[in-house]
């Protein structure tokens, strides 16, 4: 898939105000400082499309971008901020759960994992919740350019073994780098195929 157009559509904190569901939707989420904004900008080829901030997680919003006029890229706030108040955390948890469980045009959620770190409890808990809720997701390992080939492979293997303690098979896994562009085509090809399937399926309803 080639990205021809990418435009910011809207930010929301309420499910009722999200865009209409006629286009397939692909969400990106991860713990704070995982490199989400940089990866989104690299994938779309639009520098500055997703804003990077020195205070990530400050605003709790669901951010929609319209890509190529026929699918939504959704930038979800980073999770795991201890500095948020209890009220803010509860508000975000409710919005996130409602979005994941009720957004009918959500095709895939890309869960971003920092490839430099050992498996983090906060990531594993979220991944397990997604699996139990039967919400389709892809694991995206970020910042692979900051690791040597051997270390990268070792860290990925550790993560796979951790997941296979509870699962019989692994989800789709993509290694990425916002710097080198690694993984960009894999993500876009997956989105392209799923967008075509979404359109074909919905055309049968008309």
Which stretches of residues belong to each language-model region?
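Conserved G1/Walker A P-loop phosphate-binding module
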Residues: 1-83, 200-206
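Canonical P-loop GTPase G-domain recognition
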Residues: 3-15, 146-205
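Short, well-ordered secondary-structure micro-motifs
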Residues: 19, 63, 84-85, 120-123, ...
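Hydrophobic aliphatic residues
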Residues: 43-47, 100, 191
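Conserved nucleotide-binding/hydrolysis micro-motifs of P-loop NTPases
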Residues: 58, 71, 78-81, 116-118, ...
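Amphipathic alpha-helical transducer elements in NTP-driven molecular machines
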Residues: 59, 89-93, 121-124, 181-184
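Conserved nucleotide-sensing/catalytic segment adjacent to the nucleotide-binding pocket
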Residues: 68-106
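Conserved C-terminal guanine-recognition region of P-loop GTPase G domains, centered on the G4
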Residues: 94-170
């Amino acid at each position: 898939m080639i990205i021809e157009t990418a435009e910011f559509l809207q930010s929301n904190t309420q499910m009722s105000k999200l865009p209409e569901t006629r286009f397939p939707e692909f969400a990106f989420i991860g713990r704070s400082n995982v490199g989400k904004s940089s990866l989104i900008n690299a994938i779309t080829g639009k520098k500055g499309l997703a804003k990077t901030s020195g205070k990530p997680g400050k605003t709790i919003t669901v951010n929609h971008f319209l890509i190529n006029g026929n699918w939504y890229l959704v930038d979800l706030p980073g999770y795991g901020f201890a500095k948020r108040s209890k009220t803010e955390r509860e508000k975000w948890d409710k919005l996130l759960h409602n979005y994941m469980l009720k957004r009918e045009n959500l095709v895939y959620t890309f869960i971003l994992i920092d490839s430099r770190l050992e498996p983090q409890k906060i990531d594993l808990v979220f991944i397990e919740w997604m699996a139990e809720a039967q919400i389709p997701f892809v694991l995206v390992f970020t910042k692979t350019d900051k690791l040597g080939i051997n270390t990268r492979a070792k860290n990925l293997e550790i993560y796979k073994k951790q997941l296979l303690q509870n699962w019989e098979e692994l989800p789709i896994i993509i290694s990425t780098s916002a710097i080198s562009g690694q993984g960009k085509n894999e993500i876009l090809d997956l989105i392209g195929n799923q967008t075509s399937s979404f359109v074909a399926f919905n055309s049968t309803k008309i």
